[in-house]
UniProtKB/Swiss-Prot annotation:
Quaternary assembly: F-type ATPases have 2 components, CF(1) - the catalytic core - and CF(0) - the membrane proton channel. CF(1) has five subunits: alpha(3), beta(3), gamma(1), delta(1), epsilon(1). CF(0) has three main subunits: a, b and c.
Pfam families: ATP-synt
Function recorded in the entry: Produces ATP from ADP in the presence of a proton gradient across the membrane. The gamma chain is believed to be important in regulating ATPase activity and the flow of protons through the CF(0) complex.
Location of this chain's protein in the cell: Cell membrane
GO biological process, one term: proton motive force-driven plasma membrane ATP synthesis
Name of the molecule in the record: ATP synthase gamma chain
GO MF annotation terms: ATP binding; proton-transporting ATP synthase activity, rotational mechanism
SUPFAM superfamilies: ATP synthase (F1-ATPase), gamma subunit (SSF52943)
UniProt membrane topology term: Peripheral membrane protein
Length: 291
């Protein structure tokens, strides 16, 4: 019985240590989430302005029958997917949701291999490579608060692959942050841009601009920058969802540890009570034997 009591006590101590670790990790994820949410809000100020300028310029461009390759849809022979996952685990179902969605799309639409994956995050890279899938580029070890300089190269490579007709449309697949408890899988088209902003560009109220040197030159510079800003925004959004998932997972782990501790404590008290009762019974029996 003594051995049983010591084993239960050891389990309680071990679970309490685990609970302290998961609680600390939850607090770290919570702090990261607050920073990511602020970064997302700050970025939206820039994103909304460049989207407004681009849309206003495209209103005239689309109606004039533009031939800009980033605006014009072409026959789709190959599709590019930027897939954003985490670099580490302990984030609940964050990675499994997006990877399942991507696999379903590829199995349904690209059984012939007419796709290319640009992977951001070690979990996704390892997942796709283990299955021998087409990974053109990868980025591992992304910071908790990624700067544009950190992700700029892989973003510009993705846009360049579309411009060079390595693939004919580009999507970004990621978890969109809704709140601290919820995220949604998003598969958002980035290129061609015409499909992305056509509805906005067809609205009335064109803003007049005096353009220097000319519209085409400006669009040739602006459209890649606009697309890159959309992709960067998706990365920030995905990171925010990752931190929220990590916080939720660690909170769940902490709660589960507390439940285990409560169950073990009850088990320990019952075993201790049984041991005391048995000891008293043995003492009484011994005393009776001496009479």
């Amino acid at each position: 019985m003594a051995g049983s009591l010591s084993e239960i006590k050891a389990k309680i101590n071990s679970t309490e240590k685990t609970s302290k670790i998961t609680s600390a990790m939850r607090m770290v994820s919570s702090a990261k989430l607050v920073k990511s949410e602020q970064s997302a809000r700050d970025f939206q100020i820039y994103a909304s302005k460049i989207r407004q300028i681009t849309t206003d310029l495209l209103k005239a461009e689309l109606t004039s029958g533009s031939t800009n390759p980033m605006l014009v849809s072409r026959p789709v022979k190959k599709t590019g997917y930027i897939v954003i996952t985490s670099d580490k685990g302990l984030v609940g179902g964050y990675n499994s949701k997006i990877l399942k969605s991507v696999m379903e799309m590829i199995e349904e639409y690209h059984a012939d291999g007419s796709y290319s994956i640009i992977s951001i995050g070690s979990v996704g890279s390892d997942f796709f490579k283990a299955r021998g899938m087409n990974v053109s580029f990868e980025l591992r070890g992304l910071a908790d608060q990624p700067s544009f300089e950190e992700v700029g190269k892989i973003i510009s490579q993705s846009v360049a692959m579309y411009q060079n007709e390595i693939f004919d449309e580009l999507y970004v697949c990621y978890n969109h942050h809704v709140n601290s408890l919820t995220s949604q899988v998003r598969v958002q088209q980035m290129l061609p841009i015409s499909d992305l902003v056509a509805e906005e560009a067809n609205d009335e109220g064109v803003v007049g601009f005096e353009l220097e040197p000319d519209r085409d030159t400006i669009l040739n510079q602006l459209l890649p920058q606009f697309t890159e800003s959309l992709i960067y925004g998706a990365i920030i959004d995905a990171k925010t969802a990752e931190h929220a998932a990590g916080m939720t997972a660690m909170q769940t782990a902490t709660d589960n540890a507390k439940n285990v501790i409560n169950d073990l404590t009850i088990q320990y008290n019952r075993a201790r009570q049984a041991a005391i009762t048995q000891e008293i019974t043995e003492i009484v029996a011994g005393a009776n034997a001496l009479e």
